[in-house]
């Protein structure tokens, strides 16, 4: 079977199953089976797959059709132009989270020290450490997630130290910038998530309590303890979470609290400046 035929058959199977982005998914899975770069698919459409390549490709398609996320099959997801290893212990980095990176670079471009609370794959901490040329610390409650994050930091030569703890409870600071993409799915909405999210990604990284904003209210007081005066706390938030997260800033020494929406016009990033 040729590359061209394999792509067409993969697309047909994925499209008939109603899966999103069937063409792109077929390409990614075939590339994973071939251990090739994307340009190879179009420069060698008549390449004949070996028996082993076809078996791998067929298995990957079968796993995706059962609902397993593509990123769990390939074990990689790109974020801000860099490859990050993922695992079932980590949330898969989303393109929307790149808005947090952009806001951090614009708002706190001079930060020399930063903290990422609930790091998962390490995508935020690693990206900001490299883009800002800053020293980063990243925390997570999950030992397995931190193993993935450490691998990513080593692979990308990022200056990040990792600490296993609940939020930032084990840290003393100070930091110029604190970022977090904490769990923000309300408990009542967990059952409504897409199966590939609900059944495959860690609930520890998804479930944000009854309202979906409880963890923000725990992070803000810790940020007050850890930030340098004039430092920034920047969150990713859920599309219905703005009011609840703003409430976490309401009674502390915070100014310039502002919201940024994503490309779909949904509330995505909320930030505040620590001014004691």
Where are these regions (language model features)?
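Non-catalytic accessory regions of SAM-dependent methyltransferases
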Residues: 1-42, 46-49
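Mobile active-site "lid"/loop adjacent to the S-adenosyl-L-methionine
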Residues: 184-215
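A general structural signal for well-ordered alpha-helical segments in protein cores
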Residues: 7, 26-27, 54-58, 70, ...
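Conserved RecA-like P-loop NTPase ATPase core
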Residues: 29, 153, 181, 197, ...
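Conserved AdoMet
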Residues: 30-106
